[in-house]
Amino acid sequence: MAPDSGPFPDGQFLKLLPVDPRDRGTQRCRLGPAAFRSLGVRLGSPMRISLPAGGCCLCTAWPRRDGADGFVQLDLQCASPGAAAAAGRISMDRLQPVSCPPLRRLEVWPVLRPQAGAPSSDAVLEVSQELLRNRPVSRGHVVATPPGIPGPVAALHVVSGTPDPEPAGRVTPHTRITLSDKPPPQVEPPGEVTLGGLSETADSLRELLRLPLCYPLALAALGLAVPRGVLLAGPPGVGKTQLVRAVAREAGAELLAVSAPALQGTRPGETEENVRRVFQRAQELASRGPSLLFLDEVDALCPRRGGPQRAPESRVVAQVLTLLDGIHGDREVVVVGATNRPDELDPALRRPGRFDREVIIGTPTLKQREAILGVITSKMPISSHIDLGLLAEMTVGYVGADLTALCREAATCALLKNEKNQNNPKIEETDFLEAFKKVQPSSFRSSIGLTDIRPVGWEQIGGLEDVKLKLKQCVEWPLKFPQEFARMGLTQPKGLLLYGPPGCAKTTLVRALATSCHCSFVSVCGADLFSPFVGDSEKVLSQVFRQARANTPALVFLDEIDSVLGSRSVGSSGCDARERVLSVLLNELDGVGVRTVERRGSKASQQECQEILSRSVMIVVATNRPDVLDDALLRPGRLDKMVYVPPPDREGRLSILKVCTNNMPIGLNVSLENLAAETCYFSGADLRNLCKEAALFALQENGLEATTVEQEHFTEALKTVKPSLTLKDLTFYENLFKKELSNLEDH
């Protein structure tokens, strides 16, 4: 039956469009009614399609959802190695219906995903049977695992079968599937570009690009203007450029990538001329097929207008706005802008009709970092003992570029360590630990308060066992065991107040907490916040929380908070700035400070963004004067938990002395028990100072040849080192602690 050219706008050709994201992994070929009649096929009929760019695929015929003729969409779930559905036209002669007899036996060779430990053959066979169930296959073709499906198998290469699956054969529940021992030559499983942690964002971007590129006629029939602009916002190094290139390749669109700063000219009008030339080039590419114009660092080209000094920038912004408004509806052009400073863009650029949609790419989460590390290390000879999940926990705040640099540095360390075995180097866990010392997350650079802390273990803090347990229950357990807490209906406190006498390890406890939780540590003091300019302190505090939310999970530590914040109950005009800082802190604790550009993930997860970000940032404050803090700060929902850090008792002092003398050569006549009894009113800082003074006395008496610290040296040190605490101080804090207990009992 000869094809009828009437329903086809291009004669005997069909326009090849990108696959519908809903059809990924279904092995469907979407055709119009005229193509069904011309080919003489029915719903689900197998077809072998020769692709214009080379290779072929095996699909089943399905009708288009919009019923439009003259178009075809292919899912390359089962295709020859290297096959690609590039945008363009495809002749009707390339679509051939084929017979598909049931197969009694099928031999396949599995392509496994890179992961720690090799899966068992039974597990691979079970996954292969599920992947091939009721599918038409062809000898020499590769069946790729659908996107988003976990498991050890990335793809299956069809080796042979009975009867011979050439041109096609169907797998049934009675087909006996076996695994081949030898890989076939030139195996390259088709599939989507591996984006490592950006799959969810890529789906959102694909959805936006699919409408104007795949359904222009259907949208025109509905009288809808297709989205013509997309703005990607996110910190540097998260993969915005890589994401656009990968999605354009998958969509079969011509990509015109331009760096916006490169368009800047020196003479008047040169920048506008360069911008017009770029848009004209994108329109020319659209005449041959879908076109995607990518403007990287678009904030450098279109900054916020205002003031007579910014007249040149205003002219450039006006030119870009005119060009965006002038994109013809019949031209398949999508403009994508990328920026890490969305607030610096001119507001007119972000209205509907220009950059219609905004896709926010945040700092990678734990699961995303693990996926990125899996992609980066897939072609690296890493040891089987390396746990990528543990590496992901240790890389809080790292973006994709940082993780790439970390793996590259680890490979360099392995190469230098194994100079004699350069032909077969192996990357061990120690190489990554060395790389951590050299590669810091880019989000930590030039950031207020973000601190690279020296690891502090709980065992390095003597005594305070009850305080340690409370801190673990409030902060560490909710982060490490979220499912158990959710099962019991427990939520993580938003804030924690540590109060007690000075020198009792409040700051050290917070550092140990950040070390055990593997989270970002943001330490802020009064010098970081206060500024002589009105409103500057509030802006800095908001920026601190914004940076913490960008590097979640994060621990924000405000030390000596009584010197930073004011109390509104004290009617002093000199506290105006401190009261404004207090107001900003209360808003941040309540989640009011979460901005739109801090959204992450899909639409469903964006609705829960405020709650998630607020829960992922824990604030810990420390003070010696909790009585001067504002009552609104201490209510439940803000600083939920108040933990009293008492001065060490006799057992606590003994534990602290053991920690302080752990690396000190003390003599056999030194009695730490007696020292603990003689050091009443000594804080932890006083005891550490006492041990240092004793060691100095040993050096003074015996010279540089001194080998031990004796009891008499500690006795001399006790004469010079005096306790920093008094009975009056202890009474003051004990009364505060009793008052807190009485308040809890009243509630």
UniProtKB/Swiss-Prot annotation:
It catalyses: ATP + H2O = ADP + phosphate + H(+). It is found in: Cytoplasm; Cytoplasm, Cytoskeleton, Spindle; Nucleus. Its EC number is 3.6.4.10. ATP 1 binds at residues 234-241. CDD domains: RecA-like_CDC48_NLV2_r1-like (cd19503). Part of the 55LCC heterohexameric ATPase complex composed at least of AIRIM, AFG2A, AFG2B and CINP. Associates with pre-60S ribosomal particles. One of its GO terms (biological process) is autophagosome maturation. The modification N-acetylmethionine is found at residue 1. ATP-dependent chaperone part of the 55LCC heterohexameric ATPase complex which is chromatin-associated and promotes replisome proteostasis to maintain replication fork progression and genome stability. Required for replication fork progression, sister chromatid cohesion, and chromosome stability. The ATPase activity is specifically enhanced by replication fork DNA and is coupled to cysteine protease-dependent cleavage of replisome substrates in response to replication fork damage. This is ATPase family gene 2 protein homolog B. InterPro entries: AAA+_ATPase, AAA_ATPase_domain, AAA_lid_3, ATPase_AAA_core, ATPase_AAA_CS, P-loop_NTPase. One of its GO terms (cellular component) is cytosol. Belongs to the AAA ATPase family. AFG2 subfamily. Keywords: Acetylation, ATP-binding, Cytoplasm, Cytoskeleton, Hydrolase, Nucleotide-binding, Nucleus, Repeat, Ribosome biogenesis.
